[in-house]
């Protein structure tokens, strides 16, 4: 087999599909993050009623991202989307300190879910462009992330608005797609 035929075969190989669940409290920036990933306009975003799905190509993967609304009345329905999740991305509004306890509680409950057991989790400490944003290290400490032992995890500072840190987080996602512990 010549080099050209090997290259053709590699080029025609289908991307590995990855199911990503994008969760977090309302107003954390999930939809802005999703639109930033898809290189879409982020100037007119309204609260998500239900869910959005987008497919994004990245590093040989087809990332199917499910963005589920974070309003309190929608959260009980999150579990309907757990099945076959490869990566969980949890978005936190780093500037909304009064909701850290609530967001920490929701994240802890997600990490206890059987259908999400061992699923790698990326926590985006979003809105780092705001002066009042808590650093990712402070959030990690406050949420006791260091106690997570049953899966690979990462906390990533980002600003969905400016795009800063988003690609770093997605690089981690692509590196850890197959890290789901059995």
UniProtKB/Swiss-Prot annotation:
Where does it reside? Golgi apparatus membrane; Cytoplasm, Cytoskeleton, Spindle; Nucleus; Cytoplasm, Cytoskeleton, Microtubule organizing center, Centrosome
Cross-referenced Pfam families: Arf
Gene3D superfamilies for the chain: P-loop containing nucleotide triphosphate hydrolases
Q: What does this protein do?
A: Small GTP-binding protein which cycles between an inactive GDP-bound and an active GTP-bound form, and the rate of cycling is regulated by guanine nucleotide exchange factors (GEF) and GTPase-activating proteins (GAP). Required for normal cytokinesis and cilia signaling. Requires assistance from GTPase-activating proteins (GAPs) like RP2 and PDE6D, in order to cycle between inactive GDP-bound and active GTP-bound forms. Required for targeting proteins to the cilium, including myristoylated NPHP3 and prenylated INPP5E.
Q: Which gene encodes it?
A: ARL3
User: Mainly resides where?
Assistant: Golgi
Task: Spell out the PROSITE patterns in the cross-references.
Answer: ARF (PS51417)
Assigned keywords, A-Z = Cell cycle, Cell division, Cell projection, Cytoplasm, Cytoskeleton, Golgi apparatus, GTP-binding, Lipoprotein, Magnesium, Membrane, Metal-binding, Myristate, Nucleotide-binding, Nucleus, Phosphoprotein, Protein transport, Transport
Q: Which residues bind Mg(2+)?
A: 31, 48
Q: Where is the lipid attached (N-myristoyl glycine)?
A: 2
Name the record gives this protein: ADP-ribosylation factor-like protein 3
Q: How does it sit in the membrane?
A: Peripheral membrane protein
Positions binding GTP in this chain are 24-31, 48, 67-71, 126-129, 159-161
